[in-house]
UniProtKB/Swiss-Prot annotation:
Keywords: Transferase. Expressed at very low levels in the cortex and skin of ripe fruit. The gene is AAT1GSD. Belongs to the plant acyltransferase family. GO terms for biological process: alcohol metabolic process; fruit ripening, climacteric. The lineage of its organism: Eukaryota, Viridiplantae, Streptophyta, Embryophyta, Tracheophyta. The active site is at H164, N385. Involved in the biosynthesis of volatile esters which confer ripe apple fruit flavor. Alcohol acyl transferase that can use a wide range of alcohols as substrate to produce esters. GO terms for molecular function: acyltransferase activity. The keyword Transmembrane does not apply. Pfam families: Transferase (PF02458). The fruit of cv. Royal Gala exhibits a high ester accumulation, whereas the cv. Granny Smith contains low ester levels; this influences strongly the ripe apple fruit aroma. InterPro entries: CAT-like_dom_sf, Plant_acyltransferase. This is Alcohol acyl transferase 1 allele GSd. It comes from Malus domestica. Disulfide bonds: none annotated.
Length: 459
């Protein structure tokens, strides 16, 4: 079925969803990891569900989710508040119970007709997550915008936009899981939320004990042609990495790295190299890639309660001059990525918190020679079940300037990874060419395998 030439989405006026019961009226402080200048933006997430009459006959997803949101906000009541700015631009949460913004909508289209249009970079995102005037700010605005759009097939799309200073992906998932549990009839979340942002406050006295290349200024040898300040020239596409692409990339890696190399590491090294080539960066220019590393779990020794829903990550940066990155085999970039990720531990995270205090919350560089990547393939968005089963797709809706989110995607019958990328139109064409070249099977392998290159570009 073809997608209609003009998509008709009817939206009711937005409403504020408040906690279902009275909640504490108080002021809460964010941690230094939350209160970073670089997190003062909103993250869009999209979740798409098929109709499931056997599970939810005659139940309205808008009504179910609206009520579950209100009940979940009793436990996550700071999300119903507003951010205020104190001395030195320090953010605090005014827990005033004003509520989150909720929009009910319907569209004359089926999920099947939408096809790949629901995947990052989701060209129809503005239809399914309308930017109501006054909803996009950081200070004094709703911390969460949710739009539920019912489709003619009986399925629906839940799209949301979250103020990143409040939660990271793991924290948002805790909140969404609580909503989903209540939508399915639970009286309380199975994991109770924990605020306790003081666990990641700066130390007294603060002390920077690690190198933090992600916050360092670099000497700019460029002509500024790849700066991200001119948004009118930027385009978004997504690229698919399946079994064939990963097999070709692994053949380019020296034996001593293969056994310890993750799929995320390898894709990141590949993107970093191809993007640097595509941007035609001055050979002397320092280029960086940062990997967002979750501090939760035993691996990094950061002791946080199970229900902690604040930001708990760092993004250590790998650094290289453009020339060796572009001229060396892929193993060069891979080794740098692995070494940067290995620096992450509790001391690194606490050093970041202290740096925020001592250096006045510096932001990462916004030049095109910097890339930030986040692995959302195991974030758990695909497990969120409001009563209609698991979503056919769930995750970040698009790339954000310098930030690319890796998401799980099934291409036909194969599980792979979809990576949205944001670049200028000319650089995007070169990037796609470089990516096709580096993932192209040698001719002798093609003859044996008879499979064509499947790097996909989704407009």
């Amino acid at each position: 079925m073809m997608l209609p030439s003009v998509l008709q989405v009817k939206r009711l006026q937005p409403e504020l969803i408040t906690p279902a019961k009275p909640t504490p009226q108080e002021t809460k402080f964010l941690s230094e990891i939350d209160d970073q200048e670089s997190l003062r933006f909103q993250v869009p997430v999209i979740m798409c569900y098929k109709a499931n009459p056997s599970l939810n006959k005659n139940r309205n997803p808008v009504k179910v989710i609206r009520e579950a949101l209100s009940r979940a906000l009793v436990y996550y009541y700071p999300l119903a508040g507003r951010l205020r700015e104190g001395p030195n631009k320090k953010l605090v949460v005014d827990c005033n119970g004003e509520g989150i913004l909720f929009v009910e909508a319907s569209a004359d289209v089926t999920l099947e007709q939408l096809g790949d249009k629901i995947l990052p970079p989701c060209p129809l995102l503005e239809e399914f997550l309308f930017n109501f005037p006054g909803s996009g700010g950081i200070i004094g605005c709703p911390l969460l915008l949710v739009q539920v759009t019912c489709l003619t097939c009986g399925g629906f799309i839940l799209a949301l936009r979250l103020n990143h200073t409040m939660c990271d992906a793991s924290g948002l998932l805790l909140f969404l899981t609580a909503i989903a549990e209540m939508a399915r009839g639970a009286h309380a979340p199975s994991i109770l939320p924990v605020w306790e942002r003081e666990l990641l406050f700066a130390r007294n006295p603060p002390r920077i004990t690690c190198a933090h290349h992600e916050y360092e200024d670099v000497i700019d040898h460029s002509d500024g042609s790849y700066a991200f300040s001119n948004q009118s020239n930027m385009v978004q596409r997504s690229f698919y990495f399946g079994a064939k692409e990963m097999r070709v990339l692994r053949k380019q890696i020296p034996p001593h790295l293969i056994s310890t190399c993750s799929t995320f590491d390898l894709i990141t090294a590949c993107l970093w190299k191809c993007r640097t080539l595509a941007l035609k960066i001055n050979p002397k220019q320092a280029v960086r890639v940062s990997c967002i590393v979750n501090a939760r779990g035993k691996h990094h020794n950061v002791r946080l309660p199970l229900g902690y829903y604040g930001n708990a990550f760092a993004y250590p940066a790998a650094v290289s001059k453009a020339e060796p990155l572009c001229k060396n085999p892929l193993g060069y970039a891979l080794e740098l990525v692995k070494k940067a990720k290995a620096t992450m531990n509790e001391e690194y995270l606490r050093s970041v918190a202290d740096l925020m205090v001592l250096r006045g919350r510096p932001q990462y560089s916004t030049t095109g020679c910097y890339l930030i990547v986040s692995d959302n393939t195991r974030a758990g968005f695909g497990d969120v079940n409001f009563g209609w089963g698991e979503p056919v797709f769930a995750g970040p809706a698009k790339a954000l300037d310098l930030i690319s989110f890796y998401v799980q995607h099934k291409n036909n019958t194969e599980d792979g990874i979809l990576v949205p990328m944001c670049l200028s139109s000319s650089a995007m064409e070169r990037f796609q060419q470089e990516l096709e070249r580096i993932t192209q099977e040698p001719k002798e392998d093609i003859c044996n395998n008879l499979r064509s290159t499947r790097i996909m570009s989704m407009m």
